[in-house]
Amino acid sequence: LVQTVAKAVVIGWVLGCSLGFLVAIAIDRMPFLQRGLLPIASLTSAIPLVGVAPIAVMWFGFEWPSKAAVVVLMTFFPMLVSTLAGLQASNRLERELMHSYAASYTRTLWSLRLPSATPFMFAALKVNASLALIGAIVAEFFGSPISGLGFRISVEATRMNMTLVWAAVVVAAITGSLAYALLSRLERRVAFWHPSVRGRK
């Protein structure tokens, strides 16, 4: 059951987070985009999941792409907002120092601003790991006629077989917790130098 939903979760999570990151960089580089892109991005975050899932099935079919599309929609906005906040978190004096050395936008981004934004981005990655799992499971309620964790929960709940329902719920919870723990461990290795990470050790 977990293998069935894993492909949609992983691919949707990677695509959604990557898209959110790239749009955040574009908005930061060209601030005029903020007026056009942020309202649209905010709108996508407010779309009801139960309404999106059937539409995704109609567009992409019953296989994993429809679930991945729902996951992309759920994970895009948190990554966008967190990355934008992280890019603004670098110290103003440090930015002025880079400017005084005539550092380009790209050099400042890679040397100063992205490292400062790392904890913000990892926070979004961890939250999105749970959102991705939830999104894929809910999407399976509408578009997985024969398999999947969401399908199993739906079918067994209809049969009042609460044992299997709870088993599926526990599997989902454990999977989400493991993903969160792995990302937290990766964060400690990647951003070990950041005060917010050192303070958690």
Language-model features: locations:
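Transmembrane alpha-helices
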Residues: 69-73, 105-139, 167
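Generic hydrophobic transmembrane alpha-helix motif, especially the helices
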Residues: 41-78, 85-86
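Short helix-capping/hinge motifs at transmembrane helix termini and TM-loop junctions
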Residues: 27-31, 60-62, 74, 142-147, ...
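Transmembrane-helix boundary motif in ABC transporter permease subunits
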Residues: 11-41
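Short cytoplasmic-facing helical segments at TM-TM junctions of multi-pass membrane proteins
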Residues: 79-124, 150-153
